[in-house]
């Protein structure tokens, strides 16, 4: 409820033509979130607006409004549109429009316009003559007759072929292109659908071995990268000749030439050019046609464009010991009600180094050493949280660094709601940025790999269902081999039971067809996979764990559909034995 109250105070509601006309009388800048009644205002930017309102502190000249397009005649062109639209009204004139929840672009626009208003009020500049933009209808927009600032980006798609993925070449490609300045929006290992392979490789469809190529691409694990480029130009240092001598009238001398480094601006290589230069084109193919890439993204990653437009982010959250011990469940309810998805969570006692990092903003306070002692001797609770604009939203939700500051400026923050008497500090922590969140999540939830196997009796349809379940559970499919498990191969996977009397029956079942051997990666992967797999006997699994894979796909205790390593040590040994065979680089 606290969240809803903050939103009402932050943004005025305009849901009629009369209220729209009144809103245009606002002095200064009004930022208008145009929304449809069926989907509501854009929540992704509300924490940004809250931050701008607090930091700019310009209540007289900065206003935020939500306007329902369905009931306002002026906004008729925006009806039945699902993408967020933000209008900027300056003293009653609509001067700019931003399509999509592009927080950085909105942030820059607001700050620029408010800075101008301040200078105008102070007499430091004349008021610019802005042209009011037309609110055209959908037909005009379709034919490109309107100019507006858009959140759209152009992407390249790269596919690293299955043999190269087995050789871990995808890791090399990712590191190199990121170092070169390309932005990896998505990296995912997956089995490509046939329609994607045919669409991506239309340029070689007339080759005689194309059908064999399609089969190889749809049976192996490829790595797909969606890549964008921040800047089309790059500044490089080059050594150019320069002369030291000055010309004197009537004197002809051979000038002394020296070479000096000069910074020059050059056009950055395209992704394809960079791949060619790095000799990676043999195993990594690139598509740069924007229309085709957009179509392929819709097939492979249907949620990607929505997540980009709504700025879905993952952040690290930490609950201090007093909260963890006494009020964790209440906080988890708030987290759920605020629209966060909890991806991972764990209880942990922080090391001194971790505690000093989390409490760094208090390091100059007298109570700092006592605070560190408290943090390192009691359990804290860490979570990976995801939602629209997650990093900023969590920071705003928890409030400032001290209880005193929170009471003054954020009385509805978690800092105030769950204030503790032991220390004057905020009992919550959040990542400072997206980059910091990635590092902190990797630290507190380090990825782990486990060995997984789908047995021969599982049908192709069931196999694809299992792979879908694996993806939905948050596992990364790191490596995969389809293998006929001979006794030699099976011994590498089942080495712990090779001496058992029933092992010959295991070998018989495995010899009936092709098995799918996989490396699955996520935090706590071994335990998570064993939980998903369920009890060894499918009949027991149906009673104790009816949603487990063995309960759904197992036939009997030998044909129980799937297998997994018992512990991390066993998983590491099997992975080393199975996936480095013939691959000395691994």
From Swiss-Prot:
Residues 10-116 form the Thioredoxin domain. The keyword Repeat applies. Keywords: Cytoplasm, Developmental protein, Differentiation, Disulfide bond, Hydrolase, Repeat, Spermatogenesis. One of its GO terms (cellular component) is cytosol. Its EC number is 3.1.-.-. InterPro entries: NDK-like_dom (IPR034907), NDK-like_dom_sf (IPR036850), Thioredoxin-like_sf (IPR036249), Thioredoxin_CS (IPR017937), Thioredoxin_domain (IPR013766), TXND_domain-containing (IPR051766). It is found in: Cytoplasm. It holds the Pfam family NDK. SMART domains: NDK. The keyword Thylakoid does not apply. Residues 453-586 are annotated as: NDK 3. Disulfide bonds join 39-42. One of its GO terms (molecular function) is microtubule binding. Its main location: cytoplasm. Disruption phenotype: Deficient mice display normal reproductive system phenotype. Gene3D superfamilies: Glutaredoxin, Nucleoside diphosphate kinase-like domain. PANTHER family: NME/NM23 FAMILY MEMBER 8, THIOREDOXIN DOMAIN-CONTAINING PROTEIN 3. In the C-terminal section; belongs to the NDK family. This is Thioredoxin domain-containing protein 3. It comes from Mus musculus (Mouse). The lineage of its organism: Eukaryota, Metazoa, Chordata, Craniata, Vertebrata.
């Amino acid at each position: 409820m606290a969240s809803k109250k903050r939103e009402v105070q932050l943004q005025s509601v305009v849901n009629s033509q009369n209220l729209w006309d009144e809103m245009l009388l606002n002095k200064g800048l009004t930022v208008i979130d145009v929304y449809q009644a069926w989907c509501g205002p854009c929540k992704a930017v509300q924490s940004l607006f809250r931050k701008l309102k607090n930091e700019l502190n310009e209540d007289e000249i900065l206003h935020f409004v939500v306007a329902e397009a369905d009931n306002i005649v002026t906004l008729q062109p925006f009806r039945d549109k699902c993408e967020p639209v933000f209008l900027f009204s300056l003293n009653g004139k609509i001067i700019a429009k931003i399509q999509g929840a592009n927080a950085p672009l909105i942030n820059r626009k607001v700050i620029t316009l408010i800075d101008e208003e301040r200078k105008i009020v102070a007499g430091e500049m004349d008021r610019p003559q802005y042209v009011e933009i037309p609110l055209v209808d959908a037909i005009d927009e379709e034919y490109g007759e309107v100019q507006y600032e858009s959140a759209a980006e152009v992407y390249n798609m790269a596919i690293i072929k299955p043999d190269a993925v087995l050789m871990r070449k995808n890791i090399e490609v990712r590191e190199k292109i990121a170092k070169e300045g390309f932005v990896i929006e998505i990296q995912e290992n997956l089995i490509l659908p046939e329609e994607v392979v045919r669409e991506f490789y239309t340029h070689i469809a007339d080759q005689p071995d194309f059908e064999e190529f399609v089969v190889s691409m749809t049976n192996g694990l490829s790595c797909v990268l969606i890549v964008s480029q921040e800047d089309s130009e790059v500044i490089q240092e080059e050594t150019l000749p320069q002369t030291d001598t000055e010309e004197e009238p009537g004197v002809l001398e051979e000038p002394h030439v020296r070479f000096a480094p000069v910074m020059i601006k050059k056009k950055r290589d395209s992704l394809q050019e960079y791949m060619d230069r790095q000799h990676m084109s043999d195993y990594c193919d690139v598509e740069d046609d924007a229309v085709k890439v957009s179509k392929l993204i819709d097939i492979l990653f249907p949620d990607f464009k929505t997540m980009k437009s709504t700025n879905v982010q993952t952040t690290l959250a930490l609950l201090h010991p007093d909260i963890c011990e006494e009020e964790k469940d209440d906080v988890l309810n708030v987290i759920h009600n605020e629209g966060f998805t909890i991806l991972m969570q764990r209880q942990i006692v922080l090391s001194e180094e971790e505690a000093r990092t989390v409490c760094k903003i208090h390091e100059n306070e007298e109570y700092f050493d006592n605070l560190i002692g408290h943090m390192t001797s009691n359990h804290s609770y860490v979570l990976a949280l995801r939602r629209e604009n997650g990093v900023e939203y969590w920071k705003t939700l928890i409030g400032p660094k001290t209880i005193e500051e929170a009471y003054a400026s954020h009385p509805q923050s978690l800092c105030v709601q769950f204030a503790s008497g032991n220390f004057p500090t905020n009992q919550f922590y959040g990542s400072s940025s997206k980059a910091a969140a990635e590092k902190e999540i990797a630290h507190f939830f380090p990825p782990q790999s486990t060995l997984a196997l789908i047995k021969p009796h599982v049908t192709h349809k069931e196999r694809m269902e299992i792979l879908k379940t694996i993806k939905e559970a948050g596992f990364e499919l790191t490596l995969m081999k389809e293998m006929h498990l001979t006794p030699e191969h099976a011994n590498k996977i089942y080495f712990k039971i090779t001496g058992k009397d029933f092992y010959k029956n295991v070998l018989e079942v495995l010899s009936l067809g092709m098995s799918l051997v996989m490396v699955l990666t996520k935090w706590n992967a071994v335990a998570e996979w064993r939980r998903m797999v369920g009890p060894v006997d499918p009949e027991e699994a149906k009673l104790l764990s009816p949603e487990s894979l063995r309960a759904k796909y197992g036939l009997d205790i030998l044909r129980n559909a799937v297998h997994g390593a018992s512990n991390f040590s066993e998983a590491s040994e099997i992975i080393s034995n199975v996936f480095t065979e013939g691959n000395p680089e691994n």
